[in-house]
Amino acid sequence: VRGAEDYNYYLDEYVYAEELGFDGVALNEHHGNPFCMGSVMNVEASILARITKRVKIILIGNPLPVIKHPLRMAEELATIDLISRGRLVAGWVRGAGSEQFFNNANPAYNREMFEEAHDFIIQAWTRPGPWRYEGKHFHYRHVNPWTLPYQKPHPPTFIPGTLSPETIMW
């Protein structure tokens, strides 16, 4: 199967980049289109966290407005940071149109869902539990994450957006 060959080839290339002395390797994620095979970059990142030793693992980035569970995202990324012993750089994106259609997300709420998910994830990494969360788009009766990032207070985060002035200013 061609996909199996490609995924393993890409992972080998990331390992080779570390051997060549690169400081970081970047993974991208897109959904429902043919121009990016990386549809679950957190899985790839967790593999790289284990098979590399030094290189930063840079995620460009998780599409926060289309994820359904920011608590799960916080735990996944904290786990990657733990396995890598602090080499995760978490990037957040609002997601392109294809991500919204693919994930049944309403584009009218894109920005506010992005901001709410981002703020929730940072809280999940830094706020002692248990606590309750009642946001506009996400609701949790009981938040008590025990999987916390290796890096304190949390991994470096960034937003690689360039399309809207609001995102750049945010």
What are these model-derived regions, one by one?
Residues 47-48, 79-82, 170:
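Hydrophobic/aromatic ligand-binding patch that stacks against planar heteroaromatic rings
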Residues 1-59, 152-155:
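N-terminal beta1-alpha1-beta2 module of alpha/beta enzyme domains
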Residues 113-125, 140-143, 160, 170:
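Extended catalytic-interface subdomain
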Residues 1-3, 66-133:
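Flexible, glycine-rich active-site loops centered on histidine and acidic residues
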Residues 33-36, 64-68:
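Short, small-residue-enriched loops and turns at beta-alpha junctions
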Residues 1-2, 97, 139-154:
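N-terminal small/glycine-rich loop or linker at the start of catalytic domains
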Residues 5-16, 73-76, 162-170:
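Short, acidic/polar
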